[in-house]
Amino acid sequence: MNDWTIEDARAGYNVTHWSQGFYGIGEAGEVTVSPDPLNPSNKVALDTLAQDLVQAGIALPVLVRFPQILHHRVESLCDAFNQAIQKYEYQNDYLLVYPIKVNQQKTVVEEILASQVSKEVPQLGLEAGSKPELMAVLAMAQKASSVIVCNGYKDKEYVRLALIGEKLGHKVYIVLEKMSELKMVLEEARELGVTPRLGLRTRLAFQGKGKWQASGGEKSKFGLSAAQVLKVVDELKEANMLESLQLLHFHLGSQIANIRDIRQGVSEAGRFYCELRQLGASINCFDVGGGLAVDYDGTRSQSNNSMNYGLTEYANNIVNVLTDLCNEYEQPMPRIISESGRHLTAHHAVLITDVIGTEAYMPENIQAPAEDAPQLLHNMWQSWTEISGRHDQRAIIEIYHDSQSDIAEAHSLFAVGQLSLMDRAWAEQTNLRVCHEVKGLLSNNNRYHRPVIDELNEKLADKLFVNFSLFQSLPDAWGIDQVFPVLPLTCLDKAPERRAVMLDITCDSDGIVDQYVDGQGIETTLPVPAWDPANPYLIGFFMVGAYQEILGDMHNLFGDTNSAVVFVEDNGKARIESTLDGDTVADVLRYVNLDADEFMHTYEELVEQHIVEDERASILEELQLGLKGYTYLEDF
């Protein structure tokens, strides 16, 4: 593969498509970040940035945030809707509401809000789904439009806090998720002397396709049926409060890959809106919820990890459907609201870490078995000589299948004591040699060979032991088989001579990344440059900005990683705005109610009992440093 080029690397890892222009591969084979896709020359190499962070005392793994990407995502989504509104002569506006559940980190929320600071009329609000989230947005929403959407199940305290938000100058929409909430809201509103802004979440009959499709449809956890919606209208009429009903909300589910699903859902919900208006409801906001997908694998397809549409098509479909429906029913066009958290945050964060070790299969020379060796070993030797000598007429794949059958029999014979350990080791090495040889003779252009190639890629893949916890940093990769782009940050100017799998440092066999973006598809192994300990490369896990931090758990007590907020200046230099230390060992012990100070007293007692006096001080110092240390590996 001497003709390998950077374009081959870009295509092989499909960077151009999943990155949306925010990340790329430079001519020297380095992965770069460019927060403004319209100015691609303004970029920074991630490996260089990682070195700068390490020199500043920030150990790997480190989660790097690029706020400029957040700004760009907000602007691009608002622009898409603004252009669609102009195109279809829609008689209202658009508001982007950020659901903070996607990423509640202070920096993330503040930077999303900061993207609208210069706007005369901000197009940004916040959504809360719990009391803690509501308390946060009550203190932050005034930095944008002061619009707050309250979703989720509610108790009296939640409702009162939302109503107090109105007294604080916010425009708070309390979305009714179940019938019992209506009475509670009206009672608390009367007590506080507040006119509530009510919303309805309706259950659509239509259900979008995807991993989160249970969020929509008639059996959804949230929302009101058609009959319940009408009952709410009747009760509001009786209370002379129908004018308080101002928002209609529905949700098809997160990561809707097919634009037709979105169009169909908007069409059904749009008829709810128009008919409720005909019944006298004063609804003036149409909240399409989430669903705007992110193209994790870059295939622009209907797969669960992709999307078959872009921002322009998304906005055009929603605006077009609502325009036609409102004209058909002769009803005013409502303000369009979307809750597009994944779209805003996914790209902005990258986890950068190091490889702590590797395990690779390298072919070894093997000798013919002794004449008195079990017949099985002679059969395996025959397969090896036939495939290596290229003089057998049998199909390559047939020989491969024979070898797999033989190695399975060898393991069975060893288990019942009919094959020695030395014989088993010889059989395994011979089988690996056959596999290695077969792989070199197969062709991707032959469709009959492809399943075997995939099998061999997995069987012969190198293992890269990577300094991170899958459960902490990529929980969706483990929990729902979400695909995240991953690739080495340097050495991509060299042809990928090996294929590998990434394993984390937890004591759990599930701690393995088992799906990788590879060209225009998903594979179980990743093509990588050959590992050179003298010139190691770092690993980057991309598009981890949505949900991963807040969903991450502390399996094996691996805690939050270090993090950094980085801006790329106009001169192409990285400016490290701020850093935040990850969890120490003492921190994670406290999470599970273990007292580090108490442990230290115990260590002192044990040292007093078991360690000679000259060593006590140094031993205690190491134990104390251990409690203060990073939960991830630092010296290896």
Curated annotation (Swiss-Prot):
Endoplasmic reticulum is among the record's keywords: no
A GO term for molecular function: arginine decarboxylase activity
GO biological process, one term: putrescine biosynthetic process from arginine
N6-(pyridoxal phosphate)lysine PTM positions: 101
Reactions accelerated catalytically: L-arginine + H(+) = agmatine + CO2
Listed Gene3D superfamilies: 1.10.287.3440, 1.20.58.930, Alanine racemase, Lyase, Ornithine Decarboxylase, Chain A, domain 1
Cofactor(s) this protein requires: Mg(2+); pyridoxal 5'-phosphate
Record SUPFAM superfamilies: PLP-binding barrel
HAMAP family: SpeA
Described function: Catalyzes the biosynthesis of agmatine from arginine.
Alphabetized PANTHER family for the sequence: ARGININE DECARBOXYLASE, BIOSYNTHETIC ARGININE DECARBOXYLASE
Family the entry assigns: Belongs to the Orn/Lys/Arg decarboxylase class-II family. SpeA subfamily.
Name of the molecule in the record: Biosynthetic arginine decarboxylase
